[in-house]
């Protein structure tokens, strides 16, 4: 469950290392975001000499959460960290690699480019 002021790791090589959620896209006063939701975030930590800089406002899609994700078949998936992938306004990832496992639900939400870049899909 991601809410405003939550810090997330970045799961790609776009140049950002840590994000802070400032808004959840989709509804006017939605409180929590889950896997597959798009958020507006600010970069809190970035790699030097990359296109993304600290304090830049970007969009990201959540790919991992510590809160459990319950599937229709009863399976529960939980990750060790909260992580997101930086995207542009069309929903394409800004990085060329994705690190770590991501959930299968992203494919159903039309984030197929992120799924194809991921080393492991759970």
UniProtKB/Swiss-Prot annotation:
Biological process, per Gene Ontology: translation
Keyword Ribonucleoprotein assigned: yes
Keywords of the record: Chloroplast, Plastid, Ribonucleoprotein, Ribosomal protein, RNA-binding, rRNA-binding
GO cellular component, one term: chloroplast
Main subcellular location of this protein, as a coarse class: plastid
Gene Ontology molecular-function annotations: rRNA binding; structural constituent of ribosome
InterPro entries the record matches: Ribosomal_uL14, Ribosomal_uL14_bac-type, Ribosomal_uL14_CS, Ribosomal_uL14_sf
NCBIfam families in the cross-refs: rplN_bact
PANTHER family (alphabetical): 50S/60S RIBOSOMAL PROTEIN L14/L23, LARGE RIBOSOMAL SUBUNIT PROTEIN UL14M
Complexes and interactors: Part of the 50S ribosomal subunit.
Protein's UniProt name: Large ribosomal subunit protein uL14c
Organism for this UniProt entry: Citrus sinensis (Sweet orange)
Lineage: Eukaryota, Viridiplantae, Streptophyta, Embryophyta, Tracheophyta
Gene: rpl14
